[in-house]
């Protein structure tokens, strides 16, 4: 404010010209249309990845469909049974189902009777998941929404008689959990796909009548935050018309500003084109990639869908899940952990237990995970039991094994006069010292087991280090 009695000086000509110039520049900037992406990979690959995905770090994957009815072997049951004719699958059918029983006969048994989307969403929220990806359609072709081009082979016409995709999306969004839709481009036994295959994929009957109408319908109907494409491997992206779809998705779709996609858009695309990279199932890079990536893995080591023949030894241990999460985030990736519900819509207790263990760990250590960035060093020298992340000026050292002597040795951080060291979940600063040859020594809190803030991994927070 001016002092009382002061008179304002008129703006000089130079100042007026400057203000006019700045105003005109701002008007031009605002008038410019948003960038449009052309249907080619150089243009599409140049689109910046929406920030929410890198910040999310942890998501839950759900494989659910008619394959959840036989619930044996894996979600590839139909292909192993009738596509490959594996003897063990044929024997399973002979022993458990009458002669002439077809895969389509499983459809009415996919009831989702106990599917309560609010309960699922509560579980995923308690697990600390920031996004959830649901199979809308696996390679069997059955759609978990009333697809207008999947007559009598969708969850509204057969089985549950419900819109499973829509119901789960509503529940997740009440909790501000991002919603991803998995969609298989191919269908093993669809007549039009088999016709295109017979024609060497020089025709696109299946793509025009089935794949593309479904993708556009999913986007317009459910407005997903993420599209997790799969089933691309038999054909190039030119057969799938992938670049045309993605240019529409980025330019004109209702989710153009926020949507994220993966890299499975043609046999030539994985780890090369798309939004973020999956590269392959359960991908684990050996060093920091230069592109955003995601590790997708399953609690059941041998299947993505639920299977009745799962043994306890087939279930990934809680400590291994936490370790994979930590390593993935340290290397700049997201961790997408899969569960397979039953045909009734139940998530079996051991899967719930594993998810809740992740949530409990993240409730203490999430500061080092969510919205973090890789540090200049991703793991401690000469060991794979200490991993680093960073956020702003803070560095986080996550260690997977509690040292027997209660002292953690870190060689990578360089201390300064302002260094401060704490442990997430514990009040107060930790004592530390340095050695010119061996680096930093941190005295861990001496606590009874019941007072240790987390299981499986612990986080040291360092500020004022280089």
Curated annotation (Swiss-Prot):
The record marks 296 as: May be important for catalysis. Residues 1-31 form the signal peptide. Keywords: Disease variant, Glycoprotein, Glycosidase, Hydrolase, Lipid metabolism, Lysosome, Phosphoprotein, Signal. GO terms for molecular function: alpha-L-fucosidase activity. The keyword Ligase does not apply. Gene3D superfamilies: Glycosidases (3.20.20.80), Golgi alpha-mannosidase II (2.60.40.1180). InterPro entries: FUC_metazoa-typ, Fucosidase_C, Glyco_hydro_29, Glyco_hydro_29_CS, Glyco_hydro_b, Glycoside_hydrolase_SF. It is found in: Lysosome. The modification Phosphothreonine is found at residue 170. One of its GO terms (cellular component) is intracellular membrane-bounded organelle. Changing residue 410 to R: In FUCA1D; less than 1% of residual activity. It holds the Pfam family Alpha_L_fucos. It catalyses: an alpha-L-fucoside + H2O = L-fucose + an alcohol; a neolactoside IV(2)-alpha-Fuc-nLc4Cer(d18:1(4E)) + H2O = a neolactoside nLc4Cer(d18:1(4E)) + L-fucose; a neolactoside IV(2)-alpha-Fuc-nLc4Cer(d18:0) + H2O = a neolactoside nLc4Cer(d18:0) + L-fucose. Glycans are attached at residues 241, 268, 382. Alpha-L-fucosidase is responsible for hydrolyzing the alpha-1,6-linked fucose joined to the reducing-end N-acetylglucosamine of the carbohydrate moieties of glycoproteins. It is linked to Fucosidosis: An autosomal recessive lysosomal storage disease characterized by accumulation of fucose-containing glycolipids and glycoproteins in various tissues. Clinical signs include facial dysmorphism, dysostosis multiplex, moderate hepatomegaly, severe intellectual deficit, deafness, and according to age, angiokeratomas. This is Tissue alpha-L-fucosidase. It comes from Homo sapiens.
